[in-house]
């Protein structure tokens, strides 16, 4: 899978599917399930590393997990999903050269084919333009942007006409700078639909309603593995409960076996 194929999917009306992975095991599951895109998201800071936000994750963390995800793929390269890696907080906001170095490190030292970054401010658009000129495919991300949690919180974005127009202008600027697709998170469905209709690149939603070119979800949320469930991602199974019960069953079995009295060995035969 290559980035250009997602644009062809949009043109043909085929829905785009994207799921997250963070290691070889989760990558193998997502690949076997048939996702078009595997996102190594900086959400692994919370899902895997136990942080409260995505901010503490480093470029080294993202590279480590992206390498593991790529090793988990088993299909021939042409049949593998597109692997996209999130650039972490402050790896691309502190200058163009640093952004190119960070993105280049991910693509050079893993088998990822693209990177994703958040925001649509002019400084971010300039980063996208530079990366694309350097041959690095970029996926954009607007709406609720977790790396801006201390400024925007985890609130729904684009809820009034002024902010909707701003997000639309930012989306157009990201497309003009060369983004091959755009994630929109936790925005009104009508805004996502407007973006889908006016942009030539795919609009992939999460908590943005059904009027998108595709959808992305955190795999751990879909499997019901996380302690708290986001409102826009209903679990498809109670994975946490099932896993805990399976572990409890094994632990009980081991303890019960140990507690069962064993038949003492027969006494040794007397010497003749």
From Swiss-Prot:
It catalyses: 3-methyl-2-oxobutanoate + (6R)-5,10-methylene-5,6,7,8-tetrahydrofolate + H2O = 2-dehydropantoate + (6S)-5,6,7,8-tetrahydrofolate. Keywords: Cytoplasm, Magnesium, Metal-binding, Pantothenate biosynthesis, Transferase. It holds the Pfam family Pantoate_transf. One of its GO terms (molecular function) is 3-methyl-2-oxobutanoate hydroxymethyltransferase activity. Residues 251-272 are annotated as: Disordered. Mg(2+) binds at residues 42, 86, 118. Residues 262-272 have a biased composition (Pro residues). InterPro entries: Pantoate_hydroxy_MeTrfase (IPR003700), Pyrv/PenolPyrv_kinase-like_dom (IPR015813), Pyrv_kinase-like_dom_sf (IPR040442). NCBIfam families: panB (TIGR00222), PRK00311.1 (NF001452). Belongs to the PanB family. This is 3-methyl-2-oxobutanoate hydroxymethyltransferase. The gene is panB.
